[in-house]
Amino acid sequence: MKFNLIDIEDWNRKPYFEHYLNAVRCTYSMTANIEITGLLREIKLKGLKLYPTLIYIITTVVNRHKEFRTCFDQKGKLGYWDSMNPSYTVFHKDNETFSSIWTEYDENFPRFYYNYLEDIRNYSDVLNFMPKTGEPANTINVSSIPWVNFTGFNLNIYNDATYLIPIFTLGKYFQQDNKILLPMSVQVHHAVCDGYHISRFFNEAQELASNYETWLGEK
């Protein structure tokens, strides 16, 4: 997958990037509820799983916008990937640990769903942190905390503040006013992502969840 270098001197985000990366290092998170009433009903009718469906929605929106694909490469150069693949957590009930498994993204949901099922079949019972080798650099991290319908979630990453890729966390869905809602938290780096961008993410994720008939397809 191609990594496109960014010319910082000719980049409209240069002053914001330098300020929030160097002067005032700043990451932040936002949590919002996604309504999944119709989506949940439809995937149950089709015998599909909710988790990979939500992973697909997240990755689809990420791949629409460069700010969610911007990062430093292994040489420390700034740029953005053409597209991203999801790396997601799978819980092991027997020993209360989890694995992180990555799946190749496909904009066609049935094909992505098939890829997910194959990876789950091959790796979900392997009690390793990262049982599937060869994880590419162009991945986003998705995790699930399906035991709590939280109202806020924050990750504290202690490094040199150069991790620019967003991190997504899903909570337990619940019913409110005849609607099924699911909390979703997104952690971003302010150097590459502002409030407008993260708000657009939530709005587009909700749009996909509401208009599931346009992409869900046949099982």
Swiss-Prot record:
PANTHER family this protein is in?
A: CHLORAMPHENICOL ACETYLTRANSFERASE (PTHR38474:SF2), SLR0299 PROTEIN (PTHR38474)
Q: Does the keyword Transferase apply?
A: yes
What is the designated name of this protein? Answer: Chloramphenicol acetyltransferase
Q: What does this protein do?
A: This enzyme is an effector of chloramphenicol resistance in bacteria.
Share an example GO biological-process annotation for this protein. Answer: response to antibiotic
Its taxonomic placement starts with: Bacteria, Bacillati, Bacillota, Clostridia, Eubacteriales
A single MF term (Gene Ontology): chloramphenicol O-acetyltransferase activity
Q: Which organism is it from?
A: Clostridium perfringens
EC number(s) in its UniProt entry? 2.3.1.28
Q: Which domain of life is it from?
A: Bacteria
